[in-house]
Amino acid sequence: MYARSTTVRGDPQALDEAIAYMRDDAMPTIQEMEGCIGLSMMCDRDSGRCIATTAWRSEEAMHDSERAVHNIRERYAEMMRGTPEVQEWEIAVLHRLHTAPDGACCRVIWGQGDPADLDDATSTLRTSMLSRLEELPGFCSISMLVDRQSGRAVTATVYESRDAMGRAAEQAKALREEFTRQLGLEVTEVAEFDLALAHLRVPETV
């Protein structure tokens, strides 16, 4: 399975309008496209940074959708008064303990490593980290997306509320440091977002 993420760093005052557009106009259109298995959107209301991600059953389906989603992406960026940055990923890990409620938040970690080590990273996450992540306060789900050519990876851990995410912060940091140390991954950024939309039909990979 594959995903395309579109990041826009825009006007915080435009977020509600952009979320409504993605929910009411873009999402119904995208979900009817061949091979689409969902859409999510996360936002930082302070900075105006917003990341919309579409998930696809295959790499071919993702690429075939590009022309159709182009105008949607441009409209979304125009509403946010920003420039879209597009990245394509393979969905390496997806595990849900339960669905995200209204008010859910997520902590996103971007990392860089050797492309040859990505399989070890996803295996380690599955076999030695998931059960410990499930014990974190308010844990809902985790996903790991990878770019096998560049060695880039991003994990998004969803919590039921911002309060729960805060209570889990120290434990999550310790797990992150253990995971990256074992695999020689460099963490390039950690950020927190409100989960504005979560309409994913992506099957579990665990």
PLM regions with names:
Residues 1-51, 57-206:
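Short S/T/G/P-rich N-terminal loop/turn motif that feeds into the first structured element of a domain
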